[in-house]
Amino acid sequence: MAESTAGSEAEQDGMTPVRPVEAELLVVTGMSGAGRSTAADALEDHGWYVVENLPPQMLGTLAELVSHAPQSIPKLAVVVDVRSTALFADIRAALKTLEASGVTFRVLFLDANDDVLVRRFEQGRRPHPLQEGGRILDGIASERDLLHELRDSADIVLDTSEFNVHALATAITELFSETGPVALRLNVMSFGFKYGLPVDANFVVDARFIPNPHWVPQLRPHTGLDKDVSDYVLEAEGVKSFVDRYVLAIEPVLDGYRRENKHYATIAVGCTGGKHRSVAVAMELSKKLAQYPRVTVTTTHRDLGRE
């Protein structure tokens, strides 16, 4: 799918532009319970015009109307709920039509693991839309089967399993609050292997080869964000060389992502508990990657404070 670019705005004196103004179009979809409404609210807070629960067959018509308006909406987000085979066929057709007509757009797919989705539905005391009298898990399984092709083709897949409402809003802000699109957004995430691999990781770096500060009494209470721990980790034999070589190795991958219009990727750096080594290495890796042009780097620590 083509990379979205915000079009030029209408003249301030109210004159109609000579050529149509092209809006940045974002299609928001995903699993029920994964946070579409929260994402819509966050986008609206940052200047997006948001249309929720639009029937998929109306997507092309809305995009055409907006792009040809005398004073265009520069950032349009359409939240599409696909909960039946018929609606899924409609959105596939609508996206193909948009692509064929040259409309630039991106698709954001929100996902979460099954256990989290079940808990959210139970906490909200509401049934899954595809449950049909069965279990919530049955509805989730039906929806996953229905949406897997859409998920595979999405420009951005955002896993919200570890997010509360505020964390999801922050993630949406980091992705979409800037005036213009960024060629590639990297999230460097530290984590602890004992808590499981991050499901949205594109790359996994194993930092367990580094001596563990946990076994140094004066360092154990601290984290990889503290200078003493960071120095201990980064000064260990081979660590700085490893980070430098990893950055060089990943450079052609980042270039390929840009060519393929991939906008978001996660590099997960793991150690045993996600407290010392992975945190220090993630910070150093973020600093190195931030030097690359057309790359925006954010750093998160999934399991810091979990112990």
Curated annotation (Swiss-Prot):
Alphabetized Pfam families for the sequence: PapZ_C, RapZ-like_N
Cited function: Displays ATPase and GTPase activities.
InterPro entries: P-loop_NTPase (IPR027417), RapZ-like (IPR005337), RapZ-like_N (IPR053930), RapZ_C (IPR053931)
Domain of life: Bacteria
Assigned keywords, A-Z: ATP-binding, GTP-binding, Nucleotide-binding
Record: residues binding GTP: D81, V82, R83, S84
Binding residues for ATP: G30, M31, S32, G33, A34, G35, R36, S37
SUPFAM superfamilies: P-loop containing nucleoside triphosphate hydrolases
A molecular function GO annotation: GTP binding
Record-stated family: Belongs to the RapZ-like family.
UniProt lineage: Bacteria, Bacillati, Actinomycetota, Actinomycetes, Micrococcales
Protein name stated in the entry: Nucleotide-binding protein Arth_2083
